[in-house]
Amino acid sequence: MTNKEFYNKALSESSPIKQVGWENEVKAIKRYKQIAKLVPPKTHTIVDYGCGIGNFAKYVSHSAKYIGMDTHTEFVEFANEINPELQIIPTDGKGNVPECDCLVSIGVWTLRGELDDLQYWNNIVIQVNNMVKHVTGSIIINGFHNQADYKDPKLYYHDISKWIKLANLLGLKMKVLVFEKFEFVIVLKK
């Protein structure tokens, strides 16, 4: 099943959390709340890169201008139908984002599809390199780390040491937090 097929199938689900492929609604809400706490208090504009249908917006849009972005056009169209007050726009998936104070990428780099780990990581590096040019504050990234007990072959498991090298290469400060048993959150700052 391709990524597009996976997300088209997910969109037909009844729960907003399951519509973007998250299996556990309680964990997803907990994830959103914890990541929202990491958004710096004086953030004026936040980009939600890979926003799905904009579920994260309700945790941050009261305190900052929210811009959701997704490569999946069906998500963007549906999100704009159900959240007309939000700005949700398509992205080319190359990390080209509008100017912002903070960018969040929640679970975006998890479903690797047909790419091998090296190809997938190189794609992430290109995206983050482009993002850094447009983000004045924090970049907050959530995903699965490679120390997980069980690994689904369809998913990508991040090697935190690669993130450390990338942060150093880009001149960024980095903080790593463990979320749940096999998830991490990385906060990158200039």
Regions picked out by a protein language model, each given a short descriptive name:
Residues 1-38, 43-52:
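Conserved class I S-adenosyl-L-methionine
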Residues 53-87:
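Class I SAM-dependent methyltransferase SAM/SAH-binding core
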Residues 95-103:
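A short acidic, Gly/Pro-enriched loop at the edge of an enzyme's catalytic core
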Residues 102-121:
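A short SAM/SAH-binding and catalytic strip from SAM-dependent methyltransferases
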Residues 135-144:
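Conserved beta-strand signature within the Rossmann-like core of class I S-adenosyl-L-methionine
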Residues 154-170:
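Short alpha-helix
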Residues 178-190:
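Core SAM-dependent methyltransferase catalytic element
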